[in-house]
Amino acid sequence: MKSELNLPAGFRFHPTDEELVKFYLCRKCASEQISAPVIAEIDLYKFNPWELPEMSLYGEKEWYFFSPRDRKYPNGSRPNRAAGTGYWKATGADKPIGKPKTLGIKKALVFYAGKAPKGIKTNWIMHEYRLANVDRSASVNKKNNLRLDDWVLCRIYNKKGTMEKYFPADEKPRTTTMAEQSSSPFDTSDSTYPTLQEDDSSSSGGHGHVVSPDVLEVQSEPKWGELEDALEAFDTSMFGSSMELLQPDAFVPQFLYQSDYFTSFQDPPEQKPFLNWSFAPQG
């Protein structure tokens, strides 16, 4: 950001509390020009503190911002400390800035992630500077129609020097385990075939291998063509043609065991004696 601001080489911005109030905050509230425009103007209370460094104009371990002072009530003096997914909480006593005359007030705040009053304390710190002894009934800036204490100057830093991020527990995405998915009462799978597993001692780790349902269907398909041919031949050898069965003078059923047609399907049953009964009309 230094190149964009055209800052001189070796420039460092480490102002004291009094310098921040006298040369920056007072001039901002009075709409006067600031010699080194290195402080960004944002609505600080709309963001989490770890999002602010990217919005700053300058800074490495601490960042400075002008922010409108958001109040809980339009005509009141109590500020609204809600910010981002958490809130800022004041800590310690206010510190007067300026001697012999007090120009501003410094307040220290700590960011808590989550909803008040059960938020999680973080390492993000804010020093908020506001003007002191402001007559709220008559102190209206004619150029921007803001009260003189409507602007605050904020210094943001992490006391551990890290970019820690915190999120409320109820906003963390829930991870569904494999066990929960398998126990779901609704099966959203497109496949309607059951998965078959067989033990395979040769596989590594002793895991079974999956048999495809398509393979099972081909292997279990009966040979209907061969079976029909065998039944037709068996029927013809036992009873002959349909014309022979219609002869009125003689009916000679022959029960012959035909084993040749069933050898490819099952083991033949025990052989029984050959039966040949002939019935002739009595004279």
Curated annotation (Swiss-Prot):
One of its GO terms (biological process) is response to light stimulus. Expressed in roots, cotyledons, rosette leaves, cauline leaves and mature flowers. Expressed at low levels in stems and flower buds. Residues 171-211 are annotated as: Disordered. Residues 175-195 have a biased composition (Polar residues). Pfam families: NAM (PF02365). Induction: Induced by wounding, salicylic acid (SA), methyl jasmonate, drought stress, dark and sucrose starvation. Induced by chitin elicitor (chitooctaose). Induced by salicylic acid and infection with tobamovirus (TMV). By indole-3-acetonitrile, salicylic acid (SA), sodium nitroprusside (SNP), salt stress and drought stress. Down-regulated by brassinosteroid (BR) and transition from dark to white light. Residues 103-165 bind DNA. It is found in: Nucleus. Signal peptide: none annotated. Its main location: nucleus. GO terms for cellular component: nucleus. It comes from the Eukaryota. InterPro entries: NAC-dom (IPR003441), NAC_dom_sf (IPR036093). Disruption phenotype: Reduced sensitivity to indole-3-acetonitrile. Keywords: Activator, DNA-binding, Host-virus interaction, Nucleus, Repressor, Transcription, Transcription regulation. Involved in disease resistance response. May function as repressor of pathogenesis-related proteins. May function in the regulation of host basal defense responses against viral infection. Transcriptional activator involved in responses to wounding and infection with tobamovirus (TMV). Binds to the DNA sequences 5'-AAAATATCT-3' and 5'AGATTTTT-3' of CYP734A1/BAS1 and CYP72C1/SOB7 promoters, respectively. Acts as a suppressor of the brassinosteroid (BR)-inactivating enzymes CYP734A1/BAS1 and CYP72C1/SOB7, and prevents their expression in almost all tissues. Plants over-expressing NAC081 show enhanced susceptibility to the necrotrophic fungal pathogen Fusarium oxysporum. Plants over-expressing NAC081 exhibit abnormal developmental phenotypes such as dwarfism and leaf-yellowing. Plants silencing NAC081 produce abnormally shaped seeds. Homodimer. Interacts with AHK2. Interacts with AHL12 and AHL27. Interacts with the helicase domain of the tobamovirus (TMV) replicase. This is Protein ATAF2. It comes from Arabidopsis thaliana (Mouse-ear cress). The gene is NAC081.
